């Protein structure tokens, strides 16, 4: 297959999804799921008994209306009980598997496929640690063929969905005609700490539960979804400690840490990654018709918009997902892709950029074409 003819841009060695392979991976279907209960930011402030005006301001100025969460049990004295780490790990397992199964079902339905068609399952999570991994638990829960190959990406954070897509795109190119799925399942409710500090308040104001699945396949010209052309990665090693999920000795549990400078760090480096992504393709930034950016938070999205010269329309799905769900971690860009797909505004030949950001600090991007 002459890939340069099918993509409309000159294929260079750098542009190959996997050097030496001629098959191009396409998106075949997408599905999402959330946990059972949602709350407005005001409701959460009341439920958690938050009175500090600075913390209340963080919640109310987040550009988030609602989030889906599984809150801790009620405290008879007011607020919610602090859950021990063991209970949080149990919560992660239960919620991540439940949401993951439902997102996978929706994804396969979108792709016109069944569980028996699935040949590779790559599961992504950073909100809990499981051995056996999430992929094994979902294969057992759904009765997927035990011969299905699988992989798990754990602990890479909000950028990990694109890392997984990179892996599965390579697998797909090597297995034309076979269906692979990237499944991100993040039970952010299982990663909360309630200690009244500003550090945890920022996290507690931002993240929500969500799962997203993307089916991909190569070698099938009947699939109408966009093709994956190229990936670019960048790790800002000077900011390796700026986003962390590590052990809090005072809380006796894992907890998130987000440096206030993160939006500016991400924004300042976004152009570097876009330029590398488009290098050798003959494309300019103005040729990109669709931007699907991780809903990392209001300030992060604003920094990306300013530094890449995007419009609010360009990131309408990003801000819409943030408003309706909060930061869903690794799968949030797929929630945005699902909304773009439902709009039915893409046309053959259109280019899109997927962008995720996370710990490292890391920026991941992918170039796609309809």
Swiss-Prot record:
SUPFAM superfamilies assigned to the protein according to its UniProt record, in alphabetical order: Thiolase-like
Similarity field: Belongs to the thiolase-like superfamily. Chalcone/stilbene synthases family.
One Pfam family it belongs to: Chal_sti_synt_C
Superkingdom of this protein's organism: Bacteria
SS bond list: none
Catalytic residues of the enzyme: 158
CDD domains assigned: CHS_like (cd00831)
EC number: 2.3.1.246
Molecular functions per Gene Ontology: acyltransferase activity, transferring groups other than amino-acyl groups
The protein's annotated pathway: Antibiotic biosynthesis; vancomycin biosynthesis
Function of the molecule: Involved in the biosynthesis of the nonproteinogenic amino acid monomer (S)-3,5-dihydroxyphenylglycine (Dpg) responsible of the production of vancomycin and teicoplanin antibiotics. Catalyzes the Claisen condensation of four molecules of malonyl-CoA to yield 3,5-dihydroxyphenylacetyl-CoA (DPA-CoA) and three free coenzyme A (CoA). DpgA requires the presence of the dehydratases DpgB and DpgD to facilitate the aromatization of the DPA-S-DgpA or DPA-S-CoA intermediate.
Organism of origin: Amycolatopsis orientalis (Nocardia orientalis)
One GO term of the biological process aspect: polyketide biosynthetic process
Catalytic reaction list: 4 malonyl-CoA + 4 H(+) = (3,5-dihydroxyphenyl)acetyl-CoA + 4 CO2 + 3 CoA + H2O
Keywords: Antibiotic biosynthesis, Transferase
Protein name: 3,5-dihydroxyphenylacetyl-CoA synthase
Transferase as UniProt keyword: yes
């Amino acid at each position: 297959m002459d890939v340069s003819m099918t993509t409309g841009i000159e294929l260079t060695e750098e542009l190959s999804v996997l050097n030496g392979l001629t098959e191009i991976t396409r998106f075949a279907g997408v599905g999402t799921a959330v946990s059972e209960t949602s709350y407005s930011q005001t409701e959460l402030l009341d439920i958690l008994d938050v009175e500090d005006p600075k913390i209340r301001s963080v919640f109310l100025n987040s550009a988030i209306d609602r989030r889906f969460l599984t809150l801790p049990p009620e405290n008879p004295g007011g607020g919610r009980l602090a859950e021990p780490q063991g209970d949080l790990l149990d919560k992660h397992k239960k919620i991540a598997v439940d949401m993951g199964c439902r997102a996978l079902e929706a994804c396969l339905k979108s792709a016109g496929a069944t569980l028996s068609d699935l040949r590779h399952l790559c599961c992504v999570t950073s909100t809990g640690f499981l051995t056996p991994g999430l992929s094994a638990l979902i294969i057992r829960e759904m009765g997927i063929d035990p011969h299905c190959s699988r992989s798990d990406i754990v602990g890479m954070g909000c950028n990990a969905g694109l890392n997984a897509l990179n892996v599965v795109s390579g697998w797909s190119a090597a297995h034309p005609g076979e269906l692979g799925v990237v499944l991100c399942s993040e039970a952010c409710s299982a990663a909360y700490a309630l200690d009244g500090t500003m550090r945890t308040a920022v996290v507690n104001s931002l993240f929500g539960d969500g799962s997203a699945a993307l089916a991909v396949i190569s070698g099938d010209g009947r699939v109408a979804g966009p093709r994956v052309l190229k990936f670019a990665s960048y790790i800002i090693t000077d900011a390796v400690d700026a986003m962390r999920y590590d052990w809090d000795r005072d809380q006796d549990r894992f907890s998130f840490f987000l440096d206030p400078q993160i939006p500016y760090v991400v924004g300042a480096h976004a152009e570097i990654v876009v330029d590398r992504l488009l290098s050798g393709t003959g494309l300019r930034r103005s040729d990109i018709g669709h931007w699907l950016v991780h809903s990392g938070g209001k300030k992060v999205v604003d920094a990306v918009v300013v530094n890449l010269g995007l419009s609010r329309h360009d990131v309408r799905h990003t801000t819409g997902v943030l408003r309706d769900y909060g930061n869903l971690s690794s799968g949030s860009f797929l929630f945005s892709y699902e909304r773009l797909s439902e709009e039915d505004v893409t046309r053959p030949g259109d280019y899109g950029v997927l962008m995720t950001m996370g710990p490292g600090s890391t920026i991941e991007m992918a170039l796609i074409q309809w």
